[in-house]
Structure formats: C-alpha cells, structure tokens
Amino acid sequence: MADDGMLLNFTFSDDVVKKSEPKLKGGTWRDRLSAKKIAQHRAQPRKPSDGTAAPRPVKNPNRIQVSGTRPAKRQRTDDDHDAGLRDHDRAGQSQHQHQHPRQFISSLFSKNPLPRNAEEPTDEAPAEDAKPTNAPLIDGLDTFTNLGLSPTLAAHLLTKLELKAPTAIQKASISQLLKEESDAFIQAETGSGKTLAYLLPLVQRIMALSHPTNRTDATSTTDAEGQPVVHRDSGLFAIVLAPTRELCKQISVVLEGLLRCAHWIVAGTVIGGEKKKSEKARLRKGLNILVATPGRLADHLENTQALDVSNVRWLVLDEGDRLMELGFEQELQGIIKKLDARQRPSRIPGVPTKRTTILCSATLKMNVQKLGEMSLKDAIHIKADPADEDGDAKPKNDDESAFTVPAQLKQSYAIVAAKLRLVTLTAFLKRTFMRKGSVMKAIVFVSCADSVDFHFEVFTRKLQDSDENAEDSDASDTKEKPAAFTHNTIARATAFSNPSNPVTLHRLHGSLPQHVRTSTLASFARNKDASVLVCTDVASRGLDLPNVDLVIEYDPAFSAEDHLHRIGRTARLGRDGRALIFLQPGCEEGYVEILKRGYRDGGKALTRTNADDILKRGFGGNVESENKDWEEKATDWQMDLERWALEKPESLEMARRAYQSHIRAYATHVASERSMFNIKELHLGHLAKAFALRDRPSKINVPGLRQGKDDTKKDYKAARAPAAGKKRKTPGGRDDDDIPAAADTASAAQKMRAKMKEHMAGASEFNLA
C-alpha cells in the first residue's frame, strides 16, 4: 500500500506513562519488601511545607450534614503495633528492634464459668458437734496397764507423755500384739495414734528381754554383775520402715520419748540425704531399734558389714500404701529376702524364734494387699472397735476404695473459677488470720515444688523487697532466726499478716536438701505464733504437727487416699479441725461425691463455701453489703502482683515454671478420677491469671529443668563457703573458667536424669517425697 503522507498525533497525560521501576534482587523477602516500600514512599510527591494546601475532600455520598471538623486523633501508645507498621520510615529499623508480644490484661470478674451444680440449701438449725472418732477412750477401765503394759511403761506414759488412756486402735492392737506373735495388719483412720499402736508392744517386748521370767527380781534390768541384760551391743531386734524422711524423723522422736524410761535400749535412724559415714559409725556402735527408709536400708544391707540383722524379730512397715506408690516394691522384696536369709538363733533368752511383721495402713487397696502377700504370713486384721469409735455410727461395708475421715473434722469445698484462685486463697488467709489466736497453724497443699516456690515468693515479696531502713531495723533479729532462714524457706507472710497478728510462712518440698527440710519442719512445729506451711504431699503422710487447725487443699490431691492423708494433719486425737478444698466449675464439681464417701453419715457434714463470700470477707469485710469495693481491692492486688512479675525476670520465670509444672501435675490424677480432672476442659488462659501471667498460653515456655536436690545442695554449700572464709575447690584441680567443666556438668545431669527415671515412680517427678 502506498504511503499517503498522513501523520497521526496522539495526546497522553503524564500519569499514563509508567516509570520503569528497578527490580530488587538479593536478600530475604522481608528486606526486599522493606526496600520496595521505602522506594514507593520516596516517589510520592511531598506536600507543601507552608501548610496552605487545600483540605482533603471528605467523601459523603449520602449527603449527611457533618457539624464541625474531624476530631483529633488520640495519641499513639506503645501497644499500637498496627499503627507502627504503617510508618514506612521505620521499616529498615524494625528488624533491629526487640518486639515485645502484645499483652492482653483480662478482668478478674468477667467471663468466668458458672458452677454447674446449684448450691444446696443449708439448714438454719445449728449442727450438733460430732463425737470424735479418734480421741482417747474416756472409760476409766481401759487404761494402759489393763492392756498388758508394764507399770513402768504405763507410768511413763501418764507422767511424762501425759497420755491417760489409749485410743480405739491402740486398745485393739496393743492387747493383740502382746498376746500373740503372729503377723498383723493394722488399719485405722488417720490421726488415731497408729504409731504408738505398734511402738508400745515393740518396746514392751524388748524391755521384757531384760528381765526373763525365771529371775527372782522381775523389776531388775541388770544381771549379777550389775550390767544390763540388753544393751546396745546385744544386737538389732526391730526395724521400722517408713516411706518419707520426715515420717522417719517423727517416729524416731516418739520412740526416743518412750525409751526415756528404758535408757539401756538404743534407737537410731538411717535415711536418705544424710551422710553414710556417720550412719555407719552409729551402726558400728550398736542399735536395738532402727528406723529407716527402704532405699537407704537396702543400701546398708548391701554395703555395710557392721549392720547385723541376725537378731531382727520385729519388722514394721508403716504407711504401706505409700511405700508401694513410691516404687519401693523391689527394695522391700530385697530387704525381706535378706532378713530371712540372715536370721540366726539368738543367744539372748526370751527372743522369739521367728520374725513378726506388722503392716500399717489407713486404706486397704490392691497395692497394700500385694505388699501383705509379700511380707505377711497368716496375718490377723486389727481394726478399731466401732463401739469404741462412735456408738451411734453404723460401720460401712469394707471396700478397697473406702476411706473415712474423723467425725469431728469440719470439711468444706469452694467452687472457684481459675482466674480467681490466687486472690481467693489470699482473701481466705487474710480472713483466717485477721484476729490473733483464732487459728494458730495452717497447711496449704499444692501439687508441685515449683508452685510451692512461686506462692512462697508471692506471699513474702514485700518483705524481701523492703528498703534499707527496714533491713537495718530487722538486723538485730537475724541472729535469732533458725538455720532455715539462710536457705529462704522461712519468712514473714506480708500478703496476709497484720500488725496485731504477724504470720510466719514456711515452704517445704522434696527438692530441698535434707537438713533444710528437717530444720524447716522443726521450726513450723516449734513456732508458738501463727504459722502457715506451703508444701507438697511430702508433708501429708504420718506427720503429727501440733496445733494444726486448718488444712487448705489449694490443688486437689492426686487420689482420694492422698486427700485422706492431707486432711488428716488436723483433727488429730480428738481435737477439732477444719479443711477446705478448692474446686473449679465444671467437671471438678463431680469430686464432691467422692468427698461425701469418706463420711459415715453420707456427707451431711460436708458444706459448700461461696467464693464471692470469701472475697468479700477478705477484701471487703461485710458479706451482706452491696458495695463492690471488694472487687476493686481484689483487682488492685492482682494487678500489683502482675506488675511485680513483669518487673523482675526471675519472678516471671518462676511464675512460668510454676504454671507449666502445675499443668503437668494436673494430668497425673489416678485413672478413676481423671474424668473429673480432665486437662482438656482446663482453661489455660484463665489459669495463667492465677500465676500472675499476662502472656498467652502458647507463648509461655521455660526451657530446661528446675534444680534438683543435688544442685540445690551444691548451691547452698557454695553460698556458705565465702561466709566461712574457705576457698571453694573445683573438682579435679581445674579452674572455675575451665570449658570442659560445663560439659562434665551437663553429662552428669543427663546421667542423673536417666538414673532417676529408672528408679523413681511417676509421682516423684513432682517432688512428692
């Protein structure tokens, strides 16, 4: 086609022509995106700086009349991360700045689940005081002398120990064990005096060896040359096994009190945590009665030649169910086999030809029956006579899972939401110790050792963070504090103390060194002022702590039997006592039916406590008042606690570690009760509020394990070394900054954890013993 000479002109605006943009290469996609946004921001035309630019038109398609100008924007805070992302000038600096996770502060009294079960109406008529079921008998004919004890021992019980009459289980067991030499299984409720039930016949039998029946002077304990017939060199006659070190210490104290009327009989203890060298020295000197834990006794039977068990004629297994639960089955089998193999005829007249085994337990479960089949032969079952316990009570059918609580124990439960657990506990303790003398001692049971440490720091935080003036004023009192103060196990409970009634707080769990556990427990028992013990189940078995008026189960026990032993720390030997258990709304409310099974009357004495009433009494004072000041006070206390946790990294780590350990412990309930403690129905976000945490549960993570017993003991010794002026020596002659030392420590810790998994039960993971 020929060219016709036409020329076409097209007009385009400047916006149509697209400028070529350089393509960014290299780096990460975040860097490329950041550079692209910066380039786009620079390419935009800048606004005039004189401020005369025309206002931006406001789109108003509906023709709505707008009065006034647009209100000013609020000032951006640090939490407005979305607005900060729009600032392109900071795009290059965002990757170098530390971004804190956004915290959501929830309200204590919003979105809390309601209890499923309605509160049952209570009778307005005052309930009659129940007759104690574990008190000493008041019948004057039932004295210790009538049961077969010698006048010397009976007079010692009356004058020195102030025991006028035996309890029901002591009446049944003493007469039976003194009459026959067969094996026995003693079953009685907690706090009824089982320790004396087997110690009194034991001491009576050994005292009888000192004066045989063919002697003319039966009251004499010496031979013709003036020497005792039975002394510490005569041999070991009896062994008492207990599951925990604290129970062994208590049995030893009771036994030493009995033996003050028979000074020639020597008793001793061998328990874990003590120096084996000192124990071997005591064994070489000679003992007649030995109180021990199974693990340490098995070790001495294997490695200590000075331990002669050829004359052992009495073996007592105290708290048999706990011995099996803690995984001592293999140790007990080995101990029984070695005692049978090493038994020899005794040269001392009056010593029985065969060994008598006594098994004691408050419950009759399958593991106890298994232990009985392993250790007992043709055993007799000793139980308290129901007529002696309570004439009006009807005995229940024997059941493996049945357990009974003392009739005089006043037990209640509170349905508390997860977010309100900590403030409710604080309010209850505030109200309990408001007046001096109302409650002398209380025990708070929690599920794990990390939770014990956290709550101890929470309730004593103001004392430890006091100013220098307060420290100077208390400088004169530090010399009189017990040794446990140096390991931070005893402090003033500032969270619920008041000037008229100061309260001392103690903490106890299985990860503490043995000497610290012993001194802390002794301080709590000897303290004459108001005291509170926060502990795990290490203090729930067999301990007879004086003047314990209240037991609080902040975390429910792992089984009904553990619950029985927990509340058994109060209402002992006929004294009154109270117990309170915290339950969450939902499936945990079904645990009330299990609590009712422990009562002879079907749970009529079990009462329900309203959580709001506890908060009103603790933070407000008047329950019937409609004022909501108590909510503000509880919220202020919770907010102050959360700020304390955020200000200190060590406090935040402690709270997170306690939160994680609590959840792990929550999943270890027995199978029969796991439907009531279902971890899938546990609101983890609300539960974090009870540990002063504002983080989301998915962001709460604490790597590593908590310090064990050995690590805590090493730190304790390291802290004492500079004070004593001694230079700490490193193992192998290495310096402190030697690199292989860290590797050796890590490998040793790994081996220790592997060994603990092989030899310890599942409950030991949470430092229960």
Curated annotation (Swiss-Prot):
Answer whether the UniProt record assigns the keyword rRNA processing to this protein.
yes
Q: Please give the name of this protein.
A: ATP-dependent RNA helicase dbp7
Q: What is known of its domains?
A: The Q motif is unique to and characteristic of the DEAD box family of RNA helicases and controls ATP binding and hydrolysis.
Q: Which Gene Ontology MF annotations are present?
A: ATP binding; ATP hydrolysis activity; RNA binding; RNA helicase activity
Q: Which residues are recorded as binding ATP?
A: A188, E189, T190, G191, S192, G193, K194, T195
User: Can you give the residue ranges of the Helicase ATP-binding domain?
Assistant: 175-382
User: Which classification does the entry list for the species?
Assistant: Eukaryota, Fungi, Dikarya, Ascomycota, Pezizomycotina
Supply one GO CC term from the record. Answer: nucleolus
Question: Reaction catalysed?
Answer: ATP + H2O = ADP + phosphate + H(+)
Per UniProt, the short sequence motif Q motif occupies residue numbers: 142-171
Basic and acidic residues bias: start-end ranges: 15-34, 75-91, 707-718
Q: Which organism is it from?
A: Aspergillus terreus (strain NIH 2624 / FGSC A1156)
Keyword tags:
ATP-binding, Helicase, Hydrolase, Nucleotide-binding, Nucleus, Ribosome biogenesis, RNA-binding, rRNA processing
User: Which parts of this chain are annotated as the region Disordered?
Assistant: 1-137, 700-769
Its function, per the record, reads: ATP-binding RNA helicase involved in the biogenesis of 60S ribosomal subunits and is required for the normal formation of 25S and 5.8S rRNAs.
Name a biological process GO annotation.
rRNA processing
Name all Helicase C-terminal domain ranges.
408-631
PROSITE patterns from the UniProt entry = HELICASE_ATP_BIND_1 (PS51192), HELICASE_CTER (PS51194), Q_MOTIF (PS51195)
The record's listing under Pfam families reads: CTE_SPB4 (PF13959), DEAD (PF00270), Helicase_C (PF00271)
Q: Which family does it belong to?
A: Belongs to the DEAD box helicase family. DDX31/DBP7 subfamily.
Give the principal location in a single coarse category: nucleus
Q: Which SUPFAM superfamilies match?
A: P-loop containing nucleoside triphosphate hydrolases
The sequence motif named DEAD box is recorded at 318-321
Q: Does the record's keyword annotation contain Nucleotide-binding?
A: yes
